[in-house]
Design a protein with these regions (language model features):
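Short, structured active-site "lid" loops
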Residues: 1
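Anion-binding alpha/beta catalytic cores of soluble intermediary-metabolism enzymes, centered on
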Residues: 6-10, 15, 19-97
Length: 97
């Protein structure tokens, strides 16, 4: 896993698939790749298809408990991802199951 993440770090690849431990992949990614400024907790992200295109969802089961600071950080990461996808005015919402 470390070699795969280092390969991403060297800009030779943009992602990888692992059958390894999710916690290990997440921890190594945070250590080697870093996070956005002021982001303390990484979150899994997926693009979910909708009738109007797609929805970007973060923290898809990665954290058992999240406080208000974590939710704010998730919204910052979602907004950054939306900018990459050229979404100029993204809506941010909370879904709790």
């Amino acid at each position: 896993m470390r070699k795969a993440i280092e390969f991403i770090q060297s800009k030779n690849n943009i992602g990888f698939v692992s059958a390894g431990n999710t916690g290990a992949v997440t921890a190594l990614s945070k250590i080697l790749l870093g996070t956005l400024e002021n982001i303390k907790r990484p979150a899994f992200c997926s693009m979910i298809p909708t009738l109007k295109g797609f929805c970007i969802m973060l923290d898809l089961g990665a954290n058992k408990e999240s406080n208000e600071n974590h939710l704010l950080q998730f919204s910052i990461m979602g907004h950054a991802f939306a900018k990459i996808k050229n979404i100029s005015n993204p809506k941010v919402a909370i879904l709790n199951i």
